[in-house]
């Protein structure tokens, strides 16, 4: 009997002092050992006295697709990795709860006011190339589409936020002529990948001249690898802007921890890991490492509202799919 009482007491004590676990759905490059995830996990766990479980999925659009499938039964408390183009669709899903985050100090191009989604970084889409291999990069998106000598890789707009970003970029420039542009681009497309990591890895392996990424991506090669040959091609039509966001789920089992994480997300401890971890721009005054000043400057930011994207995304994806499968 004494033994049973001791075991029971031990179990109760373990349960009483077991740390709570916050489960976050995000994308694979965020959780990678070279990404910001490991350091952010360590810093937040120290602050909250909890466990942070970062679940790596393919990419932003795929994360929203999974949440729709799981519904209120999702194991996630919070999602990190959607972007501003998906806001209206995400809200229409009814899966997300309002945040309690104080947004003072957030500095996002175009401003930010939203009661559900909190931004944590931003950037601009660009095609990356190796200047030692590609001596004359295209100076516009139209030149990239029309040049017969280029091989490119990009991501699927049905699963990837960069892939969706290219679709919006193409639409913002070509308008009703976008299907013809997609057909032309398909002639020089090596492959379309589900997510960013796969596409970028193939580019680094020499399988294409250019890959869809961000204007800030060369900072990684310059700062972490001392390889200045990787560059972002500056396009005269402008570059499409992306703001990445996080939000709490209505079904969150750890709602208070989710609120705490969202506030932590715009603190120096989180934001300082963004430039040299996620290789994007922070949404606060967090300092940029030396080397970022060499990144191209975007003078013509392009964007649609999330309502415009929600109203047209299915049709625009259908346009893309029909064009690339001809």
Q: Where on the chain are the PLM-derived regions?
A:
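Extracytoplasmic ligand-binding site segments that recognize negatively charged/polar headgroups
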Residues: 21, 25-37, 58-62, 75-208
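Short beta-strand->loop
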Residues: 97-103, 115-119, 142, 222-240, ...
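Periplasmic-binding protein-like
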Residues: 108-109, 123, 182-186, 192-193, ...
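A bilobed periplasmic-binding-protein/Venus flytrap-type ligand-binding module shared by bacterial periplasmic
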Residues: 126-133, 171, 242-254, 273
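Mature extracytoplasmic/periplasmic domains
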Residues: 249-304
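Extracellular/periplasmic bilobal clamshell ligand-binding domains
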Residues: 291-326
């Amino acid at each position: 009997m004494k033994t049973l009482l001791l075991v029971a007491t031990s179990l109760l004590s373990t349960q009483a002092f077991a740390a709570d676990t916050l489960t976050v759905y995000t994308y694979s490059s965020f959780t990678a050992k070279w990404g910001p995830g490991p350091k952010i996990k360590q810093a937040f766990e120290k602050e909250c006295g909890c466990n942070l479980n970062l679940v790596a999925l393919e990419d932003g659009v795929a994360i929203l697709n999974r949440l729709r499938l799981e519904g209120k039964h999702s194991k996630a408390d919070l999602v990190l990795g959607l972007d501003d183009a998906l806001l209206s669709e995400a809200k229409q899903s009814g899966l997300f709860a309002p945040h309690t985050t104080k947004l003072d100090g957030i500095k996002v191009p175009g401003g930010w006011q939203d009661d559900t989604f909190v931004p944590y970084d931003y950037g601009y889409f660009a095609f990356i190339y190796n200047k030692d291999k590609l001596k004359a990069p295209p100076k516009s998106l139209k030149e990239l589409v029309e040049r017969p000598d280029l091989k490119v890789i990009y991501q699927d707009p049905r699963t990837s936020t960069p892939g969706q970003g290219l679709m919006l970029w193409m639409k913002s420039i070509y308008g009703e002529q976008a299907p013809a542009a997609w057909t032309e681009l398909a002639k020089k497309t090596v492959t379309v990948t589900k997510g960013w990591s796969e596409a970028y890895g193939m580019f680094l392996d020499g399988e294409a001249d250019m890959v869809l990424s961000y204007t800030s991506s060369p900072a990684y090669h310059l700062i972490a690898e001392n390889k200045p040959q990787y560059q972002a091609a500056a396009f005269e039509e402008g570059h499409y802007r992306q703001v990445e966001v996080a939000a709490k789920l209505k079904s969150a089992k750890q709602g208070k921890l989710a609120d705490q994480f969202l506030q932590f997300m715009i603190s120096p401890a989180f934001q300082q890991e963004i430039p040299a971890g996620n290789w994007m721009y922070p949404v606060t005054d967090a300092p940029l490492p030396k080397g970022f000043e060499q990144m191209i400057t975007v003078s013509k930011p392009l964007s649609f509202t999330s309502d415009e994207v929600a109203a047209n995304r299915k049709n625009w994806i259908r346009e893309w799919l029909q064009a690339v499968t001809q």
